[in-house]
Amino acid sequence: MSRTGMPVINFINFNQTGTCISMGTSEGLKIFNCDPFGRFYSDEDGGCGIVEMLFSTSLLAVVGIGDNPSMSPRRLRILNTKRHSVICEVTFPTTILAVKMNRSRLVVLLQEQIYIYDINSMRLLYTIETSSNPRGLISMSPSLENNYLAYPSPPKVINSGIKSNANTNNIGISARSSIAEGGSEYLDKGTEPLTDSSKAGADLNSVKASTETTISPGKEHSAGSGLNATSSSGTVKNGDVIFFNLQTLQPTMVIEAHKGEIAALALSKDGTLLATASEKGTIIRVFSVETCTKVYQFRRGTYPTRIYSLNFSDDNEFLAASSSNKTVHIFKLGKPNAENSSAAATNSDDDEGEADSDDGADDDGVGDSDDTRSTVSIESFDNGSHQTREPIVDSSRKTVGRMIRKSSQNLSRKAAKALGSYFPKKVTSILEPRRHFASLKIPIESGSNLKTICTIGEPLTLDISDYPELFSGSRTMAQSASISANSSDSSLTRNSNFVKMIPIRVVSSEGYMYNYVLDPERGGDCLLLSQYPLLMD
């Protein structure tokens, strides 16, 4: 229990579609529906450290925190919430750091191993030996058409009498030798074979609740085997990411995403794009899974910060990033073209080491944090056409710092635009890198260690008359009609009382869900519609 007498939140996440929230606390687990908001399942059998959903089905993957023997952090339990029963249990050699699922595969991440299962039979298909991954970073595509796994792979230091300071970036490791090493590690750990192979291959729904198996390695694959992980410069690259095909059970490519260690990574819902952020948190990069090339690069802000989550919209139009400064930045991707790909590819990793200029909407400590609902400034609505409308400005976040920063950035952009006509595209892309399209700031003052997870929902239509305090000001019906008539592809519909928005949902480690909306055409500040407590009964 916390000091306030409330349960401690150990884990919180959205499901694959962003429509449900799974939460593990010191007392048990809870499952919530996002829209309409409400709790529809809870269990208080013991503290939970991981609670993952399979879309919106009744299947849950649960890992305990060790407060009682049945809730060991090394034991994975597959639950059926409709029947309130345990389908099966699997015990691993070390603590489970992450569990990911789609409709064909279940992946379990330990600190130095990844286990891949057929989710329909819980049969162990593959074991991957990886470099140490204490943060439990891993991403799995929900799509079966592009069934990929992405995980960081910093170099492993090798005790070599042939080459000093050897690691997996500067020495080649054959698949045979790496598998042999992996096998010897398992022998040292004393891992036993499956206690009942017939149960391991049985259908998931037919396994009895009391079934418990102890894993043994199936096929093994070292993080460096079969891949060209050697750096051309001979320097150690800590920001490597491996793509692994979960259908063919083969690694496909290693990409050098960043110079520093990876802090966050996420595959898009269709499995075609990968977003990454390093420990510094100032640069967000997006890669094509098919070509393994960098297609977008964004600057989040000036000062280093920890990126906690990355999330793509369903159509890959937007990318959201939540960070330790209680902000969420939304970047607009659009459709990648040759110019975007060229500009992203020419931006070197050295950009991340430079002093980045912030876009002014948000950075560490920027913006007011009051508990009142946000209101849209009248300045953000004009009578002009869709092409000239300014981004939405949240009046509750107007500060002197933001005004000064906005003025300086406008001057910087004008200078970059003027100089850009005299320089090649490579130099222009460095002078004027892409910034965030919209942002929001969680309305709390405390919580320096606040962690947030964000997701982008499907577009919705709002009746502005339902939110008079949100869309306040002297915006008349005539103004609305004028804007609507002049914007054939705008976010406003033909009916001036309605506006098309994109929901941005954020959950925090303090136990709240925040519902924001984003104007997909104008961007700017996201508007807070509602917030709900997750720990209250």
From Swiss-Prot:
Biased composition (Acidic residues): 348-369
Region annotation Disordered: where it falls in the sequence: 184-230, 338-411
Matching InterPro entries: PROPPIN, WD40/YVTN_repeat-like_dom_sf, WD40_repeat_dom_sf, WD40_rpt
Residue ranges of WD repeats: 257-297, 302-341
Compartments where located: Preautophagosomal structure membrane; Vacuole membrane; Endosome membrane
UniProt keywords, alphabetically: Autophagy, Endosome, Membrane, Protein transport, Repeat, Transport, Vacuole, WD repeat
Topology of the protein relative to the lipid bilayer: Peripheral membrane protein
Motif L/FRRG motif positions after renumbering to this chain: 298-302
Annotated Gene Ontology cellular component terms: cytosol; endosome membrane; fungal-type vacuole membrane; PAS complex; phagophore; phagophore assembly site membrane
Listed Polar residues bias regions: 207-216, 374-386
GO MF: phosphatidylinositol-3,5-bisphosphate binding; phosphatidylinositol-3-phosphate binding; phosphatidylinositol-4-phosphate binding; protein-macromolecule adaptor activity; ubiquitin binding
Biased composition (Basic and acidic residues): 387-397
Low complexity biased stretches: 338-347
Biological process according to GO: autophagy of mitochondrion; cytoplasm to vacuole targeting by the Cvt pathway; glycophagy; late endosome to vacuole transport; nucleophagy; pexophagy; piecemeal microautophagy of the nucleus; positive regulation of vacuole organization
Description of its domains: The N-terminus might form a beta-propeller domain involved in specific binding to phosphatidylinositol 3,5-bisphosphate (PIP2), leading to the association of the protein to the membrane. The L/FRRG motif is essential for the cytoplasm to vacuole transport (Cvt) pathway, for the recruitment of ATG8 and ATG16 to the PAS in nutrient-rich medium, and for its recruitment to and dissociation from the PAS under starvation conditions.
Assembly, per entry: Component of the PI(3,5)P2 regulatory complex.
Role according to the record: The PI(3,5)P2 regulatory complex regulates both the synthesis and turnover of phosphatidylinositol 3,5-bisphosphate (PtdIns(3,5)P2). Necessary for proper vacuole morphology. Plays an important role in osmotically-induced vacuole fragmentation. Required for cytoplasm to vacuole transport (Cvt) vesicle formation, pexophagy and starvation-induced autophagy. Involved in correct ATG9 trafficking to the pre-autophagosomal structure. Might also be involved in premeiotic DNA replication.
Matching PANTHER family: WD-REPEAT PROTEIN INTERACTING WITH PHOSPHOINOSIDES WIPI -RELATED
Protein family (similarity comment): Belongs to the WD repeat PROPPIN family.
Protein name: Autophagy-related protein 18
Species annotation: Eremothecium gossypii (strain ATCC 10895 / CBS 109.51 / FGSC 9923 / NRRL Y-1056)
Lineage: Eukaryota, Fungi, Dikarya, Ascomycota, Saccharomycotina
